[in-house]
Amino acid sequence: MTTLTASPVAARENRVLADRLGGTIVREIALVAAGTIAMIVLARISIPLPFTPVPVSLGTLGALSVGTTLGARRGLASVATYVILGIAGAPVFTGTNVGWAFPSFGYILGYLLVAAIAGLAAQRGADRRIVTMAPTAVVSLFSVYILGLAWMIPFAHMTIEQGLMKGFVPFIIGDLVKAAVATGVFPVLRSIFR
């Protein structure tokens, strides 16, 4: 009688960067806390735009990085902690936004999608090669618009066209640049930390 089990070598090949550190509950908490801190720092780096309620922010790159580095479960926990802190009133969101009652809050919820997609893809090895990291980065980063626009359009009483022109079109080039950065960085990190 044979049993099917994953060999340690096969399991190691599909790990994310954070798994290289060994495993304890303290380590798990520390990784989630580090991911949350990364989100806070990167999301606070923003440029307000006068024609839209949505600022240019490194929050999406933060969510992509946290998901890719920590994996889906830890990445989601990190981003969820960041979101909960902001809803509770901690000054972690861009500008002076706290709570949930502002037009760009949907984009913050979208960070959860970004981290989940990037984390799941990284767990399957997508961050190892440029050819797989590029579509992972693009799909992950652009997923933020699903919740972002779904929240902003009704909240700000916009038409779909207005929402796209204020909450999507101005950010396409910036998100493609962020995707290019991630595509260049993560395969290199993976090759260094084998």
Annotate each language-model stretch with its function.
Residues I29-A33, L61-S65, G75-T81, S104-L109, ...:
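Hydrophobic alpha-helical transmembrane segments
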Residues V66-T69, G89-T96, V177:
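Juxtamembrane membrane-interface segments at transmembrane alpha-helix termini
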Residues T3-L21, R27, V41, V98-L149, ...:
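Short helix-perturbing small/polar motifs within transmembrane alpha-helices
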Residues A33, I37, V41, S65, ...:
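Generic alpha-helical transmembrane segments of integral inner-membrane proteins
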Residues T52, G125-R194:
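Membrane-embedded alpha-helical hairpins and interfacial helices in multi-pass inner-membrane proteins
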Residues V79-P91, G110-A121, H157-Q162, G184-R194:
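Juxtamembrane/interfacial segments around transmembrane helices
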